[in-house]
Amino acid sequence: MKTKKVKLEYRTVFLSDTHLGMRETGIQKLNHFLSHISCKTLVLNGDFIDGWALEGSGQWKKAHTRCVRLILKMVEKEKTRVVYLRGNHDDFLSKILPITFDRIKICEKYIHKGKEKKYLVLHGDCFDSFSTKRRWIARIGSIGYDNLMRFNRFYNKYRKFRGKRPFSLSAWAKAKVKSAVNHVHRYEDSLADMARKHNCDGMICGHIHVAADRIIEGIHYLNSGDWVESNSAIVEEKDGSLEILDYDQFCKKLDEHKKATFYPRANFTSASKVVSKRRKTITQKIDSLN
């Protein structure tokens, strides 16, 4: 008999910046994540497919196809609703937006109605001047980022060999370069203003590959990060609460859920009683032989 796969259940899951088509992504971790979650709504908040990478030196791998199939399986088997929001790397979708078929909706922006609050959900590239006004610079930067990730992978292999923890070169660069830090702050402030204009209590976006969860002038700002480095998502629990969940935290929760599912407390108690009884019987037999 086939054992049913253990999954973590959520009301809504928000993913962004998976960049399928880039050579260096966390695709294996993403596939593991998708195969062990269940949700009513899955929001793909932009840059799900990296059209820029596929036009250049990118590569579509079998793991990327499996990712798409996992999502379609969620739609077919679990009746999950998928909302796919256009990003700047998959801007080819602009030609067909908006479009809805079956339980899949592809659009520019989306209003998520939580249990108590409303959130404006969009990729966020519309507030990035490099993406909107200097697109050619953004494309060059994308190529450089891909190459940096490739070098970072080999560098971390060396660090692992030396017994050291992985190191993110891009995160280090973002923290050190003052202009990059200021760019992130301006970006976040602009998004908060847009949320107010849409009469929303919060904003959920991606684009800048920096996971965040904070209040900006009364607006709940959330960024899901990415699946290139941070490997993180935003999950909405059944009670409506939202939190950022990175891959390591997800694996820990999944392990705890598996233990609770396959080895509940009652089973441990009954098993210990059986073991104790058998040990007592064996001890009595040994004593009788002596």
Task: Go through each PLM region and give its residues.
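Binuclear metal-dependent phosphoesterase catalytic core
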Residues: H112-K115, I215-N290
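Nucleotide/phosphate-binding catalytic cleft detector across ATP-hydrolyzing
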Residues: M1
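Active-site neighborhood of phospho(di)ester-bond hydrolases with catalytic His/Asp-centered motifs
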Residues: L15-S16, L42-G46, V82-N88, V121-L122, ...
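Active-site-proximal loop/helix segment associated with metal-binding centers of metalloenzymes
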Residues: L122-Y187
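Core catalytic region of metal-dependent phosphoesterases/phosphodiesterases
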Residues: K5-R11, L20-G114
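Conserved beta-sheet core of the metallophosphoesterase superfamily
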Residues: D102, C107-E108, K118-L120, D125, ...
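Anionic group-transfer/hydrolysis microenvironments
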Residues: T18-H19, I49, D125, D248
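Short glycine-/acidic-enriched loop or helix-start segments at secondary-structure transitions
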Residues: A53-E55, L93-I96, S131-T132, D213-I215, ...
